[in-house]
């Protein structure tokens, strides 16, 4: 089955050790409806020999009832797992697949192309380092192509591979490929992505997916898989600005107090001076503890427990940063928000926000503008409908450190949660502290919360509950 089947059979320990040392690339496939995203992933798995025999037999059988490729095996069925997806021939949910080659491990997120599932695409893109954006060679750059490119850029994906698919349907025309490249480059001039590659391919026929195509001898670049194996993503991590959001305080006994969390940015070492935000108290790192023993250095993505020389007040939601770091503290910030719910975002409503490891109440007080994903122009808006993207002012209850998403995605992103249904209704990328933001911590309480608080104070006076309005200066 696999390119390493013989090694697995002969020496499983060597295989596991070799597999552990490979670096990992997370990437998404996106584009307009029926551009061939699922077929492309199926082709990657098939031609890199990462399909089990029973899987191949299953999709061969399914191709007779749900396939769209005639007598050929419909490789898209490897990814389109939902029954409704197979019946409609489209991708609805984000489908994840895993495979590896001799050089690298991969996690693929196949995201839906339909506009009403843009929120699913944003979810898949949030953890990716690279985006493969498919364009149908017959249709060129479409609205959804621009939308997905903009979302990928918004979420900080620095590497874009523009895969011009279905080249077999335009007779492998170099002129058509060059025309699409020029059209996309004109649009991409408005994006921030520093690394863009273009590959002409046919996922159905396998041209330029894993192996170079004989039908497109005019194309001198690498096949798609070679690009995925060689793209350099390690330098994308921020190793300068230390950020460790505290997930919980580990206190197994009286002689140990550790602060657990995933290092989001920077390099942490024992003996390093750090300070806690938002309190500003400073201390020195004593140990970096992990399940496998103490570390001399910790890097972004590692889950660690940190002990300090001093006993200072630290709790869930606080950040550990470098002692000399200048991180603004504010009760309001500017953010780009992708709205993910049928009920539109209307300024003034109170929501729950989850930012890094901190949970807090907040509200979107103003929509500065909505971005037209076709032209990237800004337009005035009073509300954000489903799948809309806008720049907003967010005010929160309390003071918190504010990170730009481009500095540290882990501490500069948040989700918006409806307080009544507990449904995630939006996702946001922080762009900095809001102009005129203070640290008053004021919040506009909903009527039912004020009434509920009053009932508790009336009927349970022994609880000594405080008036929520007085607590926040209302």
Curated annotation (Swiss-Prot):
Keyword annotations: ATP-binding, GTP-binding, Nucleotide-binding, Nucleotidyltransferase, Transferase
One example of a Gene Ontology biological process annotation: hydrogen sulfide biosynthetic process
Region annotation (G3) ranges: 110-113
Recorded superkingdom: Bacteria
Molecular-function annotations in GO: ATP binding; GTP binding; GTPase activity; guanosine tetraphosphate binding; sulfate adenylyltransferase (ATP) activity
Region (G5) residue spans: 202-204
Catalytic activities: sulfate + ATP + H(+) = adenosine 5'-phosphosulfate + diphosphate
EC number(s) recorded for this UniProt protein: 2.7.7.4
Region G1, residue ranges: 31-38
Family, as annotated: Belongs to the TRAFAC class translation factor GTPase superfamily. Classic translation factor GTPase family. CysN/NodQ subfamily.
Name of the molecule in the record: Sulfate adenylyltransferase subunit 1
